[in-house]
Amino acid sequence: MSAVKTIGIIGGGQLGLMIIEQAHLLGARTICLDPAEDAPAFKISDERIVGRFDDPAALEELCRRSDVVTYEFENVPGNLLVALEQKYNIKQGFRPLFDSQDRLREKSNACDHGLKTPAFMAVDDEESLHRAIARIGYPCVLKTRTLGYDGHGQAVLRGEADLAKARELLAVPCILEEFVPFDFEASVVLVSDGERVICFPVCLLYTSPSPRDRSVSR
């Protein structure tokens, strides 16, 4: 890590905070950009820039003061990074951000690379919703294509009775996906040095009996 002096992070939420914690363990300095003065990551970052994610001047300042730049989440205007990545060391670049900002684009890209996904169709209005349901069938999930997270901007449709809640989402472009039964959701963390890609083993941890705080036990 001696070659990297300062890591710039676009976004000061909890993910940014966790990046900073690990960066400090590796001896790196950090500078964080976020519009909120009380952003969680600001508590431990070495430097801060209070500014909007869509402010070209703020992004330029972050890049100029950093040896390498990353972003903590996908809701950063990707078009602003196109020019910046030509001048500064933004390892992830523009493309992953661009793809992850639109669920339709993200799934289409996955299919193009041979990955298996649930059946999906673009939905722009009620007519296209009915066409998509006719093809995919119930149960299915309607999702907004952008700015959805942690279940926000989604509706599970199990039959015609659920169409009313689907209409609430149709004010913006959506995607309809086949419902996939699942037992659990797993997160896979990958890292790359530009040549190699390494991931931690995927595991499912059971603790039995469940640990209890001593104060609760008493």
Functional labels for PLM-detected ranges:
Residues 66-69, 117-119, 152-153:
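Short active-site oxyanion
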